Amino acid sequence: MIFDSNYDLKDESETLRLAQNMAIHLHPSMNLYLKGELGAGKTTFVRGLLRGLGYQDKVKSPTYTLVEPYSLEKFTFYHFDLYRFKDEHEWDDAGFREYFNKASICVVEWPEKAGHILPEPDISIELSHESFGRHIHLMSHTSLGAECLKAAI
């Protein structure tokens, strides 16, 4: 069963709240892909996910480091930003494949920069600027993703 839904978010607090609600239902081995133009709120959404998972320290954008790992109590959360990739093979060359495993959650901003090399996401999230704030499109690609989204919304 696929979950596919759209929501309007009037401000940053609504974006954070939605992400925090979703985080409660995430499981190790899940992959989430975030799409949207620069400044659309992708890193804000990741910050909300991490807050929902109990992480309270600073959340940095991995634009220049490419990946920021967050060691949580039961698993590692990897936040990727592939914006600077010029070629999909840079993902493989960077050795990121090993991060996608049953003991971690991987969240990837700009997944299209890695082409079809990335594993299938459980959930894809697209954020866009609107006159009222932000618009978010949530879509599951696996049954685990659908369960997570249904429970969170």
Task: Locate each region found by the language model.
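Short phosphate-coordinating micro-motif centered on Lys-Gly-acidic
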Residues: 3-5, 51, 86-89, 97-153
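Short beta-strand-centered segment that lines the nucleotide-binding/catalytic pocket of NTP-utilizing
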Residues: 55-71
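Phosphate-binding P-loop
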Residues: 22-29
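Hydrophobic anchor at the beta1->P-loop junction of P-loop NTPases
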Residues: 32-34
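Conserved lysine of the Walker
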Residues: 42
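The conserved Walker
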Residues: 38
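N-terminal pre-Walker A segment at the start of P-loop NTPase domains
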Residues: 1-21
